[in-house]
Regions:
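Glycine-rich phosphate/pyrophosphate-binding loops
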Residues: 70-72, 76-94
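Flexible loop/turn segments at secondary-structure boundaries
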Residues: 18-20, 65, 88-97
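Conserved alpha/beta enzyme-core scaffolds, especially Rossmann-like or related mixed alpha/beta domains
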Residues: 11, 44-60, 79-86
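Short linear interaction motifs
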Residues: 49-56, 65, 152-157
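Extended, Lys/Arg-enriched charged tracts that mediate electrostatic binding to polyanionic substrates
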Residues: 91-168
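Conserved small/polar residues in nucleotide/adenosyl-binding loops
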Residues: 169-173
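Conserved oxyanion/phosphate-binding beta-strand-loop segments in alpha/beta enzyme cores
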Residues: 1-50
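Conserved phosphate/anionic-ligand binding catalytic regions in large, soluble enzymes, centered on
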Residues: 62-72
Length: 173
């Protein structure tokens, strides 16, 4: 669809409850059975490999699942589209009840890396937090806003493929 220069959908969400990628991608590419059989011939159990993959801790609950389903549908239908969200290094968080109180802890889902994502440092952007805004005017009278005394981080994007079901298309989260 790139050569036709279509309109593009950018689906933005604070969370995407994706689920595990390996099995889902193999199913969507109609390759699950073949890969499972090929691995079995080598004495490898695909289910054991699948169990090693943590859930991407990019969301929880119904809205995160809905966002992931929208991406899956867009990829399956072949729409030119992207998912845009936050890659939480330590996940949203894990919740436990201890001694009658809710306790939150980080979800270190990236401790062993993520083979399904591609780091894109060439597109890194500075993101500024806090500080104050000073207004300046240039010689033509045009207003310019200058942010001062801020904290900044470098936001590095990661591409994460969302494979469409039996469609030979994918989109990027």
């Amino acid at each position: 669809y790139e050569k036709d220069d279509p309109k593009t959908v950018y689906y933005m969400s604070m969370e995407f409850l994706l689920g595990r990628a390996l099995g889902n991608n193999l199913i969507n590419m109609t390759a699950y059975k073949e890969v499972k059989e090929a691995l079995e011939e080598m004495g490898i159990d695909l289910n054991v490999i699948e169990d090693q993959e943590p859930d991407p801790a990019l969301g929880n609950g119904g809205l995160g699942r809905l966002a992931a389903c929208f991406l899956d549908s867009l990829a399956t239908l072949g729409y030119a589209s992207y998912g845009c969200g936050i890659r939480y290094r330590y996940g949203m968080f894990k919740q436990k009840i201890r001694d009658g109180y809710q306790v939150e802890a980080p979800d270190n889902w990236l401790k062993d890396g993520n083979p399904f994502e591609l780091r894109r440092p060439e597109y890194a952007k500075e993101v500024r937090f806090g500080g104050n805004i000073r207004v300046e005017y240039d010689e033509t009278g045009k207003t310019h806003f200058v942010q001062e005394n801020y904290e900044s981080v470098m936001a590095i994007p990661y591409d994460y493929p969302i494979v469409g079901s039996v469609s030979y298309t994918h989109l990027t989260l």
